[in-house]
UniProtKB/Swiss-Prot annotation:
Transferase among keywords: no
Protein name according to UniProt: Alanine--tRNA ligase
Alphabetical keyword list: Aminoacyl-tRNA synthetase, ATP-binding, Cytoplasm, Ligase, Metal-binding, Nucleotide-binding, Protein biosynthesis, RNA-binding, tRNA-binding, Zinc
Protein's gene: alaS
Cofactor binding: number and manner: Binds 1 zinc ion per subunit.
Catalytic activity: tRNA(Ala) + L-alanine + ATP = L-alanyl-tRNA(Ala) + AMP + diphosphate
Subcellular location per the Swiss-Prot or TrEMBL entry: Cytoplasm
Family: Belongs to the class-II aminoacyl-tRNA synthetase family.
Domain notes from UniProt: Consists of three domains; the N-terminal catalytic domain, the editing domain and the C-terminal C-Ala domain. The editing domain removes incorrectly charged amino acids, while the C-Ala domain, along with tRNA(Ala), serves as a bridge to cooperatively bring together the editing and aminoacylation centers thus stimulating deacylation of misacylated tRNAs.
Length: 871
């Protein structure tokens, strides 16, 4: 049975049991700072389990894309060397949100494994938490698993409830026992059943974990029964495929065999058991799926983890003999294997290939030199040695070797890296200069009251009641005049920062005082915090207030946000469908839009984008918003952003020819935007460009400033504004002509001075020594004069100097017959050190500079004596 069939049978089975099939979420968790990447099927349902989110279904099933590389869950160093470690894997899961519990979960699991997948019952062993008698009885008395194959696992990790069979989301919150199902590969493999001293062997392999969330753990560690217990299960597709396909290692399943052959093809290595080929087969999946989900290689965060994975793959290809980009050529093989289940692979294939090749080309420029340094250090160390941390940092900083790549290579030689010294070197280089924003505080305030109802789509003023107040992150009953704090209301017209749109500002007014709102942020998904300061009087919990949004600021934000949607559509039209939003910031002054594109935009492309957006504005069409089921929105072709987390019902915005999912605030007609102008375009990361633009009155002011500046230049040049460009080109041509003439004159002057200097050359032991200053000579003139003097003097050591703007330029030259004794680099440094400078170069020609021209005469006078000592 193929892996694709196993995946589909799993989903179909649970659909037949009343489960909603939910698409895999992005590998980039949305609004969850605790996760670097999605690493389990339950991630997208976390808020449902915590009670912050509700779904229209109580049963769900998924095949979830997962990555474990970087952060707490990091399998990277083991990938390729073990049978079951991967950076990317698929997690099959079924979930109950307060619906069925242990009995049905266990029955479903057993039915699927033994009746649908037809696994032999005597090959399956299960574990339960030692105190979970309910699960134990279900397995033994209802399912009929022999008691010797139902193993109780207690607290085996050093603390109460610290067990392989007790799952906790965190130190507090939902938790509960779990039951795990193991497959016995047979006596030909070493290892014992779970709970035995030999449990880490390869005989008994866990294939499915069923977590029963039945408690809420408080800060004191007390377990309180949940009113609606839930179920969260996870089964690795790769592991169960290995079992069903009759192989022992995951790399032997159909999914990996095709990729191993692709890796062998691109590296000319026929050994499909090679750990390096396994690394490539694994890493092409992680890299391609991360790129498809919008992650871009970079130097921090998710982008840096992706770059580390790519470079680890390149290094293993290099180890197999690859000396040029090869890794990207495996992408079509992956798309052929998994593109049907995950269409985003095919949709983004061109971008994935281009980005990988760009990363490969960059690393192949430095890997050879880096490997030479690394291997040279390894040769000096014996087994058990310690690799120098400063050298590891040099490899990282100069040659692009991530630390774990160096550690990976050293591990193959049984050598460790001095990570502490590496960290110290890194710390010395970095300057920590991150200043938190004045009001970027208290998004983690403790609040358990009612949610905030948002009315800001239709109203900019609304009567509300104060539910809670915070000062310095602590709940208070009252804020007094001059005090900064956060206000929570039951109703609000203020938009809380989200989706790139900044939070609203304005005021909360009551008979007791005025609170100036300077920012609005989400405390929780549906609770808004109004950040600001009490301007007059007081504000107290329970007060009724008039919440008033700053109308001018909101209107500017709406113009900029609506223009951003039109900009996104125009960029895709002009540059291509590979353009994807990577980030945005919409505030009253401007819009900033980051997008995927591998090269700078031309002036013509910028002009075309502006024209498209302004044409939409002139059309003055009405905008339309609708709340639709996400499946219907997808059918309508609404653009969705990678990494965003969407609910089952979404807000669809139609503006001009653009259709996107968006929860922000927008103009009612495109004409309300007024005017659109791009003010800047540039790169922010590899493969990511940034456009900044202004709208409305800000765009008009920008145009007027540009017109004023152009008028000033036209006046200076004494031409009409329309003729400025041609006149500037003519002036530049004239400047270049004059510069050439000046250089020629300087050369003639220097040459003449050089001829005059010949008589000043001193004869020392048969060689001529000359040290002199040439007035008004630039570097080129000095070099030309040096060549002529060396040619005429035949055997000589010469230093020429020139002074301009308080700085000294030095050139030293030595004829070939003297370089064995007199080095030009040493000679030029002799003089440079005396005038506050330094330099270097070849034995026959060297250059330096200095900042103390007053010391130049004495420095030049020292040349003859120094040369005599060398001869």
């Amino acid at each position: 049975m193929k892996s694709s069939e196993i995946r589909q049978q799993f989903l179909d089975f649970f659909a037949s049991k009343g489960h909603q099939i939910v698409s895999s979420s992005s590998l980039v968790p949305h609004e969850d700072p605790t996760l670097l990447f999605t690493n389990a099927g339950m991630n997208q349902f976390k808020d449902v389990f915590l009670g912050f989110d509700k779904r229209p279904y109580s049963r769900a099933t998924t095949s979830q894309k997962c990555v474990r590389a970087g952060g707490k869950h990091n399998d990277l160093e083991n990938v390729g060397y073990t049978a079951r470690h991967h950076t990317f894997f698929e997690m099959l899961g079924n979930f109950s949100f307060g619906d069925y519990f242990k009995r049905d979960a266990i029955k479903y699991a057993w039915e699927l494994l033994t009746e649908v997948y037809k696994l032999p019952k005597d090959k399956l062993t299960v574990t339960v938490y030692a105190e979970d008698d309910e699960a134990y009885d279900i397995w033994t008395k209802e399912i009929g698993v022999p008691v010797e194959r139902v193993i109780r696992i207690g607290d085996n990790k050093g603390a109460r409830y610290a067990s392989d069979n007790f799952w906790m989301m965190g130190d507090t919150g939902p938790c509960g026992p779990c039951t795990e199902i193991f497959y016995d590969h047979g006596e030909k493999y070493w290892g014992g059943p779970p709970g035995s001293p030999e449990e880490d062997g390869d005989r008994f392999i866990e294939i499915w974990n069923n977590v029963f969330m039945q408690f809420n753990r408080d800060e004191a560690g007390v377990m309180h029964p949940l009113p609606k217990p839930s179920v969260d299960t996870g089964m690795g597709l790769e592991r169960v495929s290995a079992v069903l396909q009759g192989v022992h290692a995951n790399y032997e399943i159909d999914l990996f065999q095709a990729l191993l052959k692709a890796a062998a093809r691109e590296t000319s290595d026929a050994d499909l058991d090679s750990p390096s080929l396994k690394v490539l087969a694994d890493h092409i999946r992680a890299c391609s799926f991360l790129l498809a989900d919008g992650v871009i290689p970079g130097n921090e965060g998710r982008g840096y983890v992706l770059r580390r994975i790519i470079r680890r793959a390149i290094r293993h290809g290099y180890k197999l003999g690859a000396r040029a980009a090869f890794f990207h050529k495996m992408v079509p093989d992956l798309v052929a294997e998994m593109g049907m289940a995950y269409p985003e692979l095919g949709q983004n294939q061109a971008k994935i290939v281009a980005t990988l090749k760009q990363e490969e080309d960059r690393f192949f420029e430095t890997i050879e030199h880096g490997m030479a340094i690394l291997e040279g250090e390894l040769k000096s160390l014996g087994e058990g040695g310690v690799f120098n941390g400063d050298t590891a940092f040099k490899l990282h900083d100069t040659y692009g070797f991530p630390l774990d790549l160096t550690q990976d290579i050293c591990r193959e030689h049984k050598i460790t890296v001095d990570a502490a010294a590496f960290d110290a070197a890194m710390a010395r280089q970095k300057e920590q200069a991150r200043a938190a924003g004045k009001f970027k505080m208290a998004t983690n305030l403790e609040y358990d009251g009612p949610a905030t109802t948002f009315h800001g789509y239709a109203a900019l003023e609304y009567k509300a009641n104060v539910l809670a107040l915070y000062k310095d992150g602590i709940a208070v009953n009252q804020l007094n005049e001059g005090e900064m704090g956060v206000v929570v209301l039951d109703d609000t017209p203020f938009y809380a920062e989200s989706g790139g749109q900044v939070g609203d500002c304005g005021a909360l007014q009551s008979v007791h005082g005025i609170f100036a709102v300077e920012d609005t942020q989400k405390i929780q998904a549906t609770v808004f915090g109004h950040h600001g300061v009490v301007k007059t009087g007081t504000i107290t919990v329970g007060n009724g207030v008039a919440a008033k949004v700053d109308v001018q600021a909101r209107q500017r934000i709406m113009r900029n946000h609506s223009a951003t949607h039109l900009l996104h559509k125009a960029l895709r039209e002009v540059l291509g469908d590979h353009v994807q939003q990577k980030g945005s910031q919409v505030d009253p002054d401007k819009t900033r839009f980051d997008f995927v594109h591998n090269q700078p935009m031309t002036d013509e492309e910028i002009r075309r984008v502006e024209n498209i957006v302004n044409a939409e504005i002139l059309a003055n069409v009405a905008t339309e918003t609708r709340v639709l089921p996400i499946a219907e929105a997808q059918k309508l072709g609404a653009m969705m952003l990678f990494g965003e987390k969407y609910g089952d019902d979404v807000r669809v915005l139609d503006i001009g020819s653009s259709r996107e999912l968006c929860g922000g605030t927008h103009v009612s007609r495109t004409g309300d935007i007024g005017l659109f102008s791009i003010t800047a375009e540039g790169g922010v990361a590899a493969g990511v460009r940034r456009v900044e633009a202004v709208t409305g009155d800000n765009a008009l002011a920008y145009m007027q400033d540009m017109e004023s500046a152009l008028g000033g230049v036209a006046g200076t040049l004494k031409v009409l504004p329309k003729d400025v460009h041609g006149r500037v080109l003519a002036v530049l041509d004239q400047v270049k002509k004059l510069e050439r003439e000046l250089a020629a004159l300087k050369g003639k002057l220097a040459s003449a001075q050089g001829d005059d200097m010949l008589s000043n050359a001193v004869d020392i032991k048969g060689a001529k020594v000359l040290a002199a200053t040439l007035e008004g000579a630039d570097v080129n003139a000095l070099r030309e004069t040096m060549d002529k003097l060396k040619d005429k003097l035949k055997s000589a050591a010469i230093v020429l100097a020139s002074v301009a703007d308080g700085k000294v330029t030095l050139i030293a030259g030595v004829t070939a017959d003297l370089t064995g004794k007199v080095k030009a680099g040493e000679l030029v440094n002799l003089v440079a050190q005396q005038i506050g400078g330094k330099g270097g170069g070849r034995p026959d020609m060297a250059q330096a500079g200095g900042t103390q021209p007053e010391n130049l005469p004495a420095a030049l006078a020292s040349v003859a004596g120094w040369v005599e000592g060398k001869l």
